[in-house]
Structure formats: C-alpha cells, structure tokens
C-alpha cells in the first residue's frame, strides 16, 4: 500500500498539474485525457494480466508484493490524475490571473494558491481512488499470489517484498473456497468497516481543508 500510494500520488498530481496548467489545449491533451478515462474504466483483471506479464515475467519479479503494488499503482494512477484535474478546474481563473498579475511566477502561483484551493478535491479524489481498490482481489491473484505469513524482522520485511503476499480479499476468497465461513464473514465485516472509514475520512478531510482555506 505504501509503495503504491508513494508512486501513484505524486505522479498523478504532477501529471494533472502539467495537463491543466502547462500543456496547451489541443490534440495531445485530448488524447491523454481520453487515455486516462479509458484506463480508469478497464476491468481490474486486465491490469492483473498485464502486471503478471510485464512486472512478473518481463522484469522477473514473479509472484510478489512488488508486482502487486506496481500493478495497483497503474490502476489508481489514472483515477488520481483525473480527479486532480477536476479539482484544479474548480479553482476560478481569477485566482490565477490575479497572482500572475502581481508578478508571481507560475510555479509559485500553483504552489501557494492553486494547490491549497484545490486541496479538498484532491484529497477526496485520492482517498476515493484508494477506496476503489481496497477490496481488490482479481489483479492481485495474478500478481501477488496468496501468501499470508507476516515478516518478523525488518530485514525479513524487505525480503518479503519479493515473495508472494495476499490481501484480506484474497483470504476471504480462499476461506469461502475452503468452507471456513466464520472466518470469511469476519474478513468481510472488517472490509466493510474499512470502506466506511475511508468514506468518513474523505468527508472529514474535505471539510477540514475547506474550513482552513476559508478561515
């Protein structure tokens, strides 16, 4: 999760800033936007097959947590990019022209005015993108496998990144397959709580940033 978010978040936000603030409107921007919208709607199992072939076989990572993390990164990257773009478009153009009119550089305007103004929407978009794949299992079955042993030391943790590793949704599937219904329903309940928590966190952070910006 940390690997996925640490890659997808800065790349997605940076891509949205470039497309919205630097790139000239035209065919290139339309193609990129169409591509991101298409990727956002592709079934997760397709990402899983691509991740298995590219990260697992071509790059030689095999069935591992890294392969699964990189695959999930590709899944949420277009979502974060599009959500950030929409958040940036909600900022009035008068903010941009006013800052540039008093001599501020474009990057200074983006860093101090545009991003803080769009932050509620950006945070909401990121959390919703992450929430979409909390219950993901199809892509991970093809890339990360179904291992569930936790590392006991820090060195074992980094070694575990190159080994098979499952998620709660995969364990839910395996438990149902084995007839372990009590375990399966317990995992399902935890997943529901996590999804509800993400939704509440989204609303809380959006209101918090909006209040700080206005006050």
Q: In which residue ranges do the predicted regions lie?
A:
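C-terminal transmembrane helix and the adjacent membrane-cytosol boundary/short C-terminal tail
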Residues: 85, 89, 93, 127, ...
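Transmembrane alpha-helices
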Residues: 106-144
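Generic hydrophobic transmembrane alpha-helix motif, especially the helices
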Residues: 36-72
């Amino acid at each position: 999760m940390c690997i996925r978010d640490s890659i997808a978040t800065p790349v997605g936000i940076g891509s949205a800033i470039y497309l919205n603030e630097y790139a000239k409107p035209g065919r290139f921007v339309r193609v990129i936007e169409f591509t991101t919208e298409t990727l956002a709607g592709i079934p997760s199992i397709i990402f899983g097959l691509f991740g298995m072939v590219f990260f697992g076989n071509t790059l030689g990572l095999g069935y591992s947590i890294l392969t699964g993390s990189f695959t999930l990164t590709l899944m949420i990257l277009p979502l974060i990019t599009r959500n950030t773009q929409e958040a940036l478009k909600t900022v009035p153009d008068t903010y941009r022209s006013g800052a540039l009119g008093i001599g501020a550089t474009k990057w200074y305007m983006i860093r101090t005015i545009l991003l803080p103004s769009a932050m509620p929407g950006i945070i909401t978009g990121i959390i919703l993108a992450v929430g979409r794949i909390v219950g993901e299992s199809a892509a991970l079955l093809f890339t990360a496998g179904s291992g569930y042993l936790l590392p006991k030391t820090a060195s074992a943790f980094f070694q575990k990144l190159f080994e098979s590793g499952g998620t709660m949704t995969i364990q839910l599937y395996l438990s149902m397959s084995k007839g372990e219904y009590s375990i399966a329903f317990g995992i399902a309940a935890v997943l529901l709580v996590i999804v509800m928590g993400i939704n509440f966190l989204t609303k809380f952070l959006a209101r918090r940033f909006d209040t700080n910006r206005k006050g």
